[in-house]
Amino acid sequence: MARFYRRRKFCRFTAEGITHIDYKDVELLKQYISDNGKIVPSRITGTSTKYQRQLATAIKQARYLSLLPYTDNHQG
């Protein structure tokens, strides 16, 4: 029977040496938002606690400044 090995999650920010997450970097922030507009949890993305907090703050700031939507675009 073949065993399924799950790929180890790692913090992208630690690996790339990023020290601060900028709220103006919308393309980066979009990668950590679900289709519904929710912030994806760190247990799914593998982001460390320190950067998950910075990420959440940056996303909330970008939402407040209308750089990111609060929710998805409702159709119908």
From Swiss-Prot:
Q: Which GO terms describe its cellular component?
A: cytosolic small ribosomal subunit
Name the PROSITE patterns for this protein. Answer: RIBOSOMAL_S18
Q: Which Gene3D superfamilies match?
A: Ribosomal protein S18
Keywords, A to Z, come to:
Ribonucleoprotein, Ribosomal protein, RNA-binding, rRNA-binding
GO MF assignments = small ribosomal subunit rRNA binding; structural constituent of ribosome
Any one of the GO BP annotations: translation
Which pairs of positions does the record mark as disulfide bonds?
A: none
Name the family the entry cites.
Belongs to the bacterial ribosomal protein bS18 family.
HAMAP family listed in its UniProt record: Ribosomal_bS18 (MF_00270)
How it assembles, according to the record, is: Part of the 30S ribosomal subunit. Forms a tight heterodimer with protein bS6.
Record function comment:
Binds as a heterodimer with protein bS6 to the central domain of the 16S rRNA, where it helps stabilize the platform of the 30S subunit.
Name listed for the protein in its UniProt record: Small ribosomal subunit protein bS18
What is the organism of origin for this protein?
Answer: Psychrobacter arcticus (strain DSM 17307 / VKM B-2377 / 273-4)
The record's gene field reads: rpsR
